[in-house]
Curated annotation (Swiss-Prot):
Biological processes annotated in GO: 'de novo' pyrimidine nucleobase biosynthetic process; 'de novo' UMP biosynthetic process; amino acid metabolic process
Family the entry assigns: Belongs to the aspartate/ornithine carbamoyltransferase superfamily. ATCase family.
Keywords: Pyrimidine biosynthesis, Transferase
Classification via HAMAP family: Asp_carb_tr
Designated name of the protein: Aspartate carbamoyltransferase catalytic subunit
Role: Catalyzes the condensation of carbamoyl phosphate and aspartate to form carbamoyl aspartate and inorganic phosphate, the committed step in the de novo pyrimidine nucleotide biosynthesis pathway.
The species this protein was found in: Symbiobacterium thermophilum (strain DSM 24528 / JCM 14929 / IAM 14863 / T)
Amino acid sequence: MARLKRKDILGLRDMTVEEIDLILDTAEALKDLATRPIKKVPTLRGKALATLFYEPSTRTAKSFELAGKYLGADVITISASTSSVQKGETLKDTARNLEAMGIDAVVLRHSMGGAPHLLARALRASVINAGDGLHEHPTQGLLDMLTIRQRKGRFKGLKVAIIGDSYHSRVARSDIFALTKYGAEVWLAGPSTLLARGFEEWGVRTTTRVEEALEGADVVIVLRLQLERQQKGLFPTVAEYHRFWGVTPERLRLARPDALLMHPGPLNRGVEISTAVADGPQSAILEQVTNGVAVRMALLYLLLGGGEAA
């Protein structure tokens, strides 16, 4: 097994195609573990993982917890709301104390962009970015890549329409960085106030017309309307948003008949996506969740078990 020649997973912008391929290949090899009657192997026995979340999470936090446990690691879950952070302890001090307890890897989600990079420089332990501010969400990007590869068999030449609030979406950024490395044609669509900026150099096309992005799309990635990160006035109302930019069955028919429908979750049904689309035959949303466990198992294996940093 080839080695992952890095200590930390901080983003996909600087990750090579070879590294991404290694992670996806490893995830595919480990994926069936989650479906076995006994979901446990001793690969990471004796290793300790801490998940440290300063923002709410269900899928990412719990899939990392399961990934570690399936591989035999000891896993502790720390929520900022119930930790010494409430007493004024800094992020760096919290992580250093965890390392002093023998933690081998820290999974961090934080509202501040660059927080995982700060920890990576301060710790000997591996740091995995589980989402930092408006920066990146690399493990979501990797599980999206795995889902597309398994369903489509390729990336090059695919038209991928990313619909919704890309401005506030770290998922969109990681998806863009990964997909464009493989030659996919990426479109962003949504209100002009919610479109990510500065991706022209990556070959990304933007439009305020959802229909233009969906026309002939092979993959449709719908993004959540992140009201908690927004200022007022970025769009009229939630109802108006759904009317003009929501992905409905009628709009999805503009994509290719075999188009893949994805969403990083959590869903706002009736806002960015209709229930008929979310639960329809083209939806791979639950498959993404399954692949999330596999990708996170692969990263833990490569960082702590079979892929020691060079």
